[in-house]
Amino acid sequence: MAGITSARIAQIEARRDELQALMARGDLPSDQFVQLSKDYAEIEPVAQAAGEVRRLRAELDVLKGMAEDEAGDAELRAMAIEEAEEIRARLPEAERALALKLLPRDAADERSAMLEIRAGTGGDEAALFAGDLFRMYQRYAEDRGWRVELISASAADLGGYKEVVASVTGAGVFARLKFESGVHRVQRVPVTESGGRIHTSAATVAVLPEAEEVDVHIDDKDLRIDVYRSSGPGGQSVNTTDSAVRITHLPTGLVVIQQDEKSQHKNKAKALKVLRTRLYEMERERLASERAGARKSMVGSGDRSERIRTYNFPQGRVTDHRINLTLHRLSEILEGPGLDDLVGALIAEDEAERLAQLDG
């Protein structure tokens, strides 16, 4: 485990023991006990992984001693040699599991996420593709037991979306979807193409960790809230009351418009949720760039202008350009469950990059 110091592991184990003693006292206020329990749940897996590595190493030392004891029983020596080989095979995986648990965690990983998809170059075909992507993420979410709530949608004339925003709620949503941010490109024959020519279109995906009220404080004086009547395709009014809401955050200039609900109150609540999430992401980006002279990750830059993936319909393939992975299972991926293989490969690549940095 090059680069992993025993001092850090000892510090974690000492903190684990301290937390156990504190929680056993029985006289703590409930809020303090809850916080200590969270701290314990975070470091206990690290301590367990360290204990497993230590146990395997100690067992290997004993077995090596038995195998090298020429005065010992020949049958016992043979058994010791065999068991030592088994432990040598298990030890690297145990060490890697410990190393992964020691990596710095993204505090947002366990959060729910805001998913935003916008049609890019390609007109009607790009909007249809944006709809395909949204359905892919919906099905993927359903497969994992997450809840998807539509926040806003701007439908296109031939189907699909010019823009769609949804909240995806569940444990660890952001951790699995954060590498989806970027430009997704599609190559296929559009429904409007009579000559059978393949066109290239694109849609942009942004995945943001959802913010809670405690994360972002918004002063009322920093907001300008305008209300007006909702409008449908072509600009015609679809509501007789002023239910649509436009919120402008004056310090940053961020503008959020929400008109999908018939209730002004519901539209305002949804708009504030989107605004809070975008402000939280701005702060995350600021802190990351401050820390960052740091890691230029091939996988996790999160740059929304970066072309990350191509969906080629004639060849039935999906290629993720960040890790040079091509899967000839386009239909299965667009159906949702097949997306997990891409997501898993991206997470594994990110872990490998961070482990290499830890060892370096």
UniProtKB/Swiss-Prot annotation:
Post-translational modification: Methylated by PrmC. Methylation increases the termination efficiency of RF1.
Molecular function as annotated in GO: translation release factor activity, codon specific
GO-annotated cellular components: cytoplasm
Claim: Protein biosynthesis is one of the keywords in the record: yes
Localization in the cell: Cytoplasm
Residue(s) carrying N5-methylglutamine: Q236
InterPro entries assigned: PCRF, Pep_chain_release_fac_I, Pep_chain_release_fac_I_sf, Prokaryotic/Mito_RF, RF-1
Highest taxon listed in the record's lineage: Bacteria
UniProt keyword list: Cytoplasm, Methylation, Protein biosynthesis
Similarity comment text for this entry: Belongs to the prokaryotic/mitochondrial release factor family.
Function as written in the Swiss-Prot or TrEMBL entry: Peptide chain release factor 1 directs the termination of translation in response to the peptide chain termination codons UAG and UAA.
Protein name (record): Peptide chain release factor 1
Species of the source: Rhizorhabdus wittichii (strain DSM 6014 / CCUG 31198 / JCM 15750 / NBRC 105917 / EY 4224 / RW1) (Sphingomonas wittichii)
Phylogenetic lineage: Bacteria, Pseudomonadati, Pseudomonadota, Alphaproteobacteria, Sphingomonadales
